């Protein structure tokens, strides 16, 4: 606890250097992957707790367990987590809570719920991270496991509860710096590496006939559908913000017109020796408009950026497969012609 207090005192507001990288045990990764894929079959969001410890600037994740899934509102999830960690402590297993994990569908991990949950975790447990596992991308052969932490600017903005455009400009917060990605490393014990080497020798050699498979239209279709939905949401947010700006502009115009009229009337009163009317009487008639919440639009912009990156990456891979397949087909036809 003393080490945590010292690290907290040394941290600056401008940069978050609490954690440099995350080291995850292979068994913990397998537990997360198994849980996320089981819940993805039911189209549910998988979430769980991460256990481990902090060594210098490295967050070591050595174990994890899923959050309870129950429709009973009387169930105390916090008590459940404390009970699990208490029992792990009895069997001499790392029981310190260092974060949480959740599954992701087609890369759509950034959300209001994720931001709020990580804020509460990071303000109560300084070193905590959120690990996001993309089930669909991993099922295609690309292990997608990423660790994130809220940036100091995002924490300050959420702590102030001010999500107006002025607050975003002052803190220089955008969708690209709400979260900071922390490098994650998977580590196995020497015995595990030996066993995996032996299993690798027992596995049959892959012929590689699926490497050039182009029948992945459903992946692109899901990404495009999600992208269209997010663009539509961002358009609605833009319409609301434009209406707010129009109302503010109209109010400012009327306010300046009223102040100009009052100034002319006060000039007449001054020439007649009568007392002038203070400008506060006019200003009180125009109450300041409440600025709309821009956090939703920022998160939606981040989701659009993520989908666009995934689509670009997927299309580049598909084009590469297409050109390679074309070259192989031409070579095959030339060989058969001989």
UniProtKB/Swiss-Prot annotation:
Compartments it resides in: Cytoplasm
Domain of life: Eukaryota
Residue span, MPN domain: 22-154
PROSITE patterns, alphabetized: MPN
Keyword Protein biosynthesis: yes
Record keyword Magnesium present: no
GO molecular-function terms, A-Z: metallopeptidase activity; translation initiation factor activity
Pfam families for this protein: eIF3h_C, JAB
Cellular component aspect of the GO annotation: eukaryotic 43S preinitiation complex; eukaryotic 48S preinitiation complex; eukaryotic translation initiation factor 3 complex
Family annotation (InterPro entries): eIF3h, eIF3h_C, JAMM/MPN+_dom, JAMM_MPN+_peptidase_M67A, MPN
SMART domains xref list: JAB_MPN
GO biological process: formation of cytoplasmic translation initiation complex; positive regulation of Notch signaling pathway
Keywords carried by this UniProt record: Cytoplasm, Initiation factor, Protein biosynthesis
Family the entry assigns: Belongs to the eIF-3 subunit H family.
Task of the protein: Component of the eukaryotic translation initiation factor 3 (eIF-3) complex, which is involved in protein synthesis of a specialized repertoire of mRNAs and, together with other initiation factors, stimulates binding of mRNA and methionyl-tRNAi to the 40S ribosome. The eIF-3 complex specifically targets and initiates translation of a subset of mRNAs involved in cell proliferation.
Quaternary structure and interacting proteins, as annotated: Component of the eukaryotic translation initiation factor 3 (eIF-3) complex. The eIF-3 complex interacts with pix. Interacts with mxt.
PANTHER family the record matches: EUKARYOTIC TRANSLATION INITIATION FACTOR 3 -RELATED
Protein name (database record): Eukaryotic translation initiation factor 3 subunit H
Taxonomy of the source species: Eukaryota, Metazoa, Ecdysozoa, Arthropoda, Hexapoda
């Amino acid at each position: 606890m003393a080490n945590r207090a010292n690290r907290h005192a040394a941290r600056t507001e401008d940069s978050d250097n609490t954690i440099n990288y995350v080291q995850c045990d292979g068994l913990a990764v397998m537990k997360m992957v198994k849980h996320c894929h089981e819940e993805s079959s039911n189209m549910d969001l998988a979430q769980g707790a991460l256990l481990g410890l902090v060594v210098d600037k490295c967050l070591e994740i050595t174990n994890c367990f899923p959050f309870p899934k129950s429709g009973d509102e009387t169930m105390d999830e916090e008590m459940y987590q404390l009970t699990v960690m208490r029992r792990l402590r009895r069997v001499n297993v790392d029981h310190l809570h260092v974060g949480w994990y959740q599954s992701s569908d087609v890369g759509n991990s950034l959300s209001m719920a994720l931001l709020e949950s990580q804020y509460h975790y990071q303000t109560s447990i300084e070193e905590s991270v959120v690990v996001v596992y993309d089930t669909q991308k991993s099922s295609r052969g690309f292990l997608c496991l990423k660790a994130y932490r809220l940036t100091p600017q995002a924490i300050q903005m959420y702590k102030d509860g001010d999500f107006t455009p002025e607050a975003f400009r002052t803190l220089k917060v955008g969708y690209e710096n709400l979260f900071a990605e922390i490098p994650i490393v998977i580590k196995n014990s020497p015995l595990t590496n030996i066993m995996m080497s032996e299993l690798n020798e027992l596995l049959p050699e892959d012929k590689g006939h699926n490497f050039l498979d182009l029948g992945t239209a459903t992946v692109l279709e899901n990404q495009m559908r999600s992208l269209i939905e997010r663009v539509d949401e961002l358009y609605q947010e833009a319409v609301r913000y434009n209406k707010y700006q129009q109302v503010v502009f109209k109010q400012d115009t009327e306010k300046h017109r009223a102040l100009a009229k009052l100034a002319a009337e006060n000039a007449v009163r001054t020439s007649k020796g009568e007392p002038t009317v203070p400008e506060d009487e006019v200003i009180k008639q125009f109450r300041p408009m409440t600025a709309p919440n821009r956090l939703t639009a920022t998160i939606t912009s981040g989701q659009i950026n993520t989908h666009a990156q995934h689509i670009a990456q997927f299309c580049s891979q598909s084009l590469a497969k297409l050109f390679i397949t074309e070259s192989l087909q031409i070579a095959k036809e030339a060989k058969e012609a001989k």
